[in-house]
Amino acid sequence: MALIMKYIDSMHHYMDKYGDPRTKDWPLMSSPFPTLALCLGYVYLVKVLGPRLMENRKPFQLRNTLILYNFVQVVFSAWLFYEIGISGWLTGHYNFRCQPVDYSNHPKTLRMVHACWWYYFSKFTEFFDTFFFVMRKKTSQVSTLHVIHHGCMPMSVWFGVKFTPGGHSTFFGLLNTFVHIVMYTYYLFTAMGPQFQKYLWWKKYLTSLQMVQFVAIMVHAFQLLFIDCNYPKAFVWWIGMHAVMFLFLFNEFYQSTYKATKRRRAAAAEARRLAAEEAKLQNGSAVSSNGSAITANGHHGKNGSVHHHSNGSATSNGTSLLSNGVGSNKAADYYVRGDLPAEIEITQRQPSSRNQVQ
């Protein structure tokens, strides 16, 4: 126990010595342990405690809550993008090739430092993405990728705000807040209901946008390994490897989702083809049967009653023919879901008119 306390004291001494004095007394900045505790608590809550509490409960209906939350996140992300951009990246003050950290108390510099802290704070607000999934029992969306992404980010950004608030690494925040504007706009429209689905034609590009973001961050960070720049190499590797890890995770998710969608579409197409073939065979049998009935009527022309009823049978089969044609799409459901359409089942059970006359 004494050894652990000695290690903690030495770590605090190191952080006091090398940490940025401007952020030393800001909320959650004096020590990494509160942030670490919040991240571990988040993982436990969404993977263990939350699903256990919701196991025997009905999913919460959070439509209005989600609309409000996503709207706030869009506004918050837009404000962060503006603050990070106006403090350097979008004004020409920052250099995309190499931007050392400015440790002065210049107003524009302090504006960037404050933007960095608020960006760090935003990583905690994003925990609610997962909390709402758990409350709505959308457990499939609480994936390993999702939990790793949200669970690691606050701790990662904490180190940036503690030691290098500003400079080259804030390019990460600039791109990330832009992507979040797009992402939470999509979530907002989705929460507002089906009538807004027609405006979401671009949703298939969201994962691609995420991957482009990580490639840009990776290239922007790793370029400092090949040029002389007064920026800590440890943070170059930290940010670059984060980008590489998330790039591979998102790419794996993209590929698995794309392949699964492709398989579902192929299965649906095959089901429609089989249903059409079966309907065609059934219709052929119905036409052949009608032909026999009409021939039989010709041989029994004196019996007007029989002729009338037999022709009625042909008409009935004609109706069945149309019904089978219309029902081919519903028959496809049988191959996909295993539920036999009602009208086909009734047609199969119904005796012919000729048998009724006999």
From Swiss-Prot:
Please give the name of this protein. Very long chain fatty acid elongase AAEL008004
Q: What kind of membrane protein is this, topologically?
A: Multi-pass membrane protein
Instruction: Cite a GO CC annotation.
Output: endoplasmic reticulum membrane
Which InterPro entries does this one have?
Answer: ELO_fam (IPR002076)
List localization entries: Membrane
Q: Which domain of life is it from?
A: Eukaryota
State the reactions this protein catalyses: a very-long-chain acyl-CoA + malonyl-CoA + H(+) = a very-long-chain 3-oxoacyl-CoA + CO2 + CoA
Q: Which UniProt keywords apply?
A: Fatty acid biosynthesis, Fatty acid metabolism, Lipid biosynthesis, Lipid metabolism, Membrane, Transferase, Transmembrane, Transmembrane helix
Q: Which GO terms describe its biological process?
A: fatty acid elongation, monounsaturated fatty acid; fatty acid elongation, polyunsaturated fatty acid; fatty acid elongation, saturated fatty acid; sphingolipid biosynthetic process; very long-chain fatty acid biosynthetic process
Q: Which Pfam families match?
A: ELO (PF01151)
Q: Which family does it belong to?
A: Belongs to the ELO family.
Enzyme class (EC, first level)? transferase
Q: Where is the composition biased (Polar residues)?
A: 285-295, 311-322
Stretches with biased composition (Basic residues): 299-310
Function, in words: Could be implicated in synthesis of very long chain fatty acids.
Q: Identify the stretch(es) annotated as Disordered.
A: 285-322
GO molecular function terms listed in the Swiss-Prot or TrEMBL record: fatty acid elongase activity
Write out the transmembrane intervals.
26-46, 66-86, 115-135, 147-167, 171-191, 207-227, 234-254
The record's EC number reads: 2.3.1.199
